[in-house]
Amino acid sequence: MTFLSFLISGISLGSIYAIIALGYTMVYGIAKMLNFAHGDVIMVGAYICFYATSRFELPAIAGVLLAIVVCTILGIVIERLAYKPLRAAPILAVLITAIGVSYFLQNAALLLWSSNPTVFSSVVPEGSVSLFGGQLTIPYVTLVTIAACIVIVLVLVWFTGKTKMGKAMRACSEDKGAAQLMGINVNGTISLTFAIGSGLAAIAGVLLCSAYPTLVPTTGAMPGIKAFTAAVFGGIGSIPGAMLGGVLLGIIEIFAKAYISTQLSDAIVFAVLIVVLVVRPAGLLGKQVREKV
């Protein structure tokens, strides 16, 4: 049962990466921007939930909802102040700005909450499900994380494919100029995309710290990088690709730690990404696009 236990742990970790990667893939798919501050929004969401539930003793669901609301507003503010003025700027300017926003959020967290590790109280009730006569034990937080990822992906696929606003997002991703001529509010659509991505980051932050209950101002940095890797792995711009990339990345990381080396697990994850991109540059589910000159 050890193999199955590692597999489930990998799927759970990968589900967290997938939820974060969905934020990257939606922002890139619609706005064609890489928001490297996304990982730090994860940290903000976790801190908001922690203070809401531990310090102000709000119910867990209220803490999660408050984290989502705060991060959603934060995402809109970041887009309006940092990224909107740079839509016509070179990609290097956008990347430098994203890194600057990331460091700003980390240092603001240091000022507000200090660098001391905080023990995060899980929003998921403690306990586990035993299978095969107790040979396999699955914590509730693992089940909730996997279920949350599946539900979020299904909702996003439905939203982007069936709703008016979702179709507006798809139109903007294809051609912003044509979408604007058709009466679509491009600025509002991009802001909504950042809001959704940041709300997902809050959920991912709460789930991440519920599973690994140590919270510091740099909590979201490495998961953010790995989730970006997952988005590229699966095909950035593709919602199913983000989920597939995240889950595969989580499985690879857990098995690398279990059977190869804990120290080399991150190197193995990024090495697999390089191999995939050499073989299929658009990612596993990404579309190969040829531009005519």
Regions found by a protein language model. Name each.
Residues 1-20, 48, 60-63, 89-94, ...:
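Membrane-interfacial amphipathic/re-entrant helices at transmembrane-helix boundaries
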Residues 8, 30-77, 81, 86, ...:
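Membrane-embedded helix boundary and interhelical linker motif in transport proteins
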Residues 13-14, 135-215, 239-245:
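Helix-loop-helix "hairpin" substructures at the membrane interface of multi-pass membrane proteins
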Residues 17, 57-69, 191-201, 207-271:
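Transmembrane alpha-helical segments in multi-pass inner-membrane proteins
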Residues 24, 57-101, 108, 244-249, ...:
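Alpha-helical transmembrane segments within multi-pass membrane transporters and channels
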Residues 37, 61-62, 92-93, 164, ...:
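Residues that define the loop-to-transmembrane-helix transition and helix capping
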Residues 46-50, 68-74, 99-107, 148-157, ...:
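Hydrophobic core segments of alpha-helical transmembrane domains in multi-pass membrane transport
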Residues 85-86, 91-162, 189, 255, ...:
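Transmembrane helix-bundle core of multi-pass membrane transporters
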